[in-house]
Amino acid sequence: MAHAWGYGPADGPESWAESFPIANGPRQSPIDIVPTQAQHDPSLKHLKLKYDPATTKSILNNGHSFQVDFVDDDNSSTLAGGPITGIYRLRQFHFHWGSSDDKGSEHTIAGTKFPCELHLVHWNTKYPNFGEAASKPDGLAVVGVFLKIGAANPRLQKVLDALDDIKSKGRQTTFANFDPKTLLPASLDYWTYEGSLTTPPLLESVTWIVLKEPISVSPAQMAKFRSLLFSSEGETPCCMVDNYRPPQPLKGRKVRASFK
């Protein structure tokens, strides 16, 4: 039986170190990004994202978030450039959000929280598969995008419309022909640092690429995220909210900026 973990008082982030001691490791995520303390690095390259909508596979409520999974057996949907070397394949994207619009993101910017954060998870093709890559220091690259309250975002709607079919934990349905590039902001300026998965097993294998510019989401769209359940069918319903880990100590790491 895998270690049970969640976001409640008993099984939440404060308790994860009991089963996953790396929770107190040297390169944990998320962090608070302080723009005035981030160093502009002119050697950082532009991000090259090449996503093929045909690789979209399914959408799943995993009991912690919901994720959209992609076929990753060839280089159809990839990330290159930026701070990384080589080609990383898109595996899935998922979100973290709060119970209200004043919190929910994992990364914060000078202490400012956003209501939601999108994570696009990629793995380094120098390793044979995702599982292998996830344990390597340069195995994963995750692009983080903040969602900020504003106008309704039509590009989010296809994803949100699918949530009715995966309300409870363990539910999965086909999800086809979606281009994740449509969820990215106009500017791909980013901060980058070496970190970890933000959920157990909290492996320290992630090059984080956090975009400076948020995308918009309306209050009604945020309410749709909160209609999901942590609980399985037949259990007492428990709303999926506040599924974020708070910022972790920087422990001497450098945060670099791709922009001045």
From Swiss-Prot:
Gene3D superfamilies membership: Alpha carbonic anhydrase
Protein name as annotated: Carbonic anhydrase
InterPro entries documented for this protein: CA_dom, CA_dom_sf, Carbonic_anhydrase_a-class, Carbonic_anhydrase_a-class_CS
Residues the record lists as binding substrate: T198, T199
GO molecular function, one term: zinc ion binding
EC number(s) given by UniProt: 4.2.1.1
One GO cellular component term: cytoplasm
Cofactor(s) listed: Zn(2+)
PROSITE patterns: ALPHA_CA_1, ALPHA_CA_2
Domain (Alpha-carbonic anhydrase) ranges: 3-259
Stated family: Belongs to the alpha-carbonic anhydrase family.
Residues at which Zn(2+) binds: H94, H96, H119
Region (Disordered) location: 1-31
Catalysed conversion reaction: hydrogencarbonate + H(+) = CO2 + H2O
Pfam families tied to this protein: Carb_anhydrase
Catalytic residues, chain numbering: H64, Y127
Keywords associated with the record: Lyase, Metal-binding, Zinc
Function (record text): Reversible hydration of carbon dioxide.
Gene Ontology biological process terms from the UniProt entry: carbon dioxide transport; hypotonic salinity response; regulation of pH
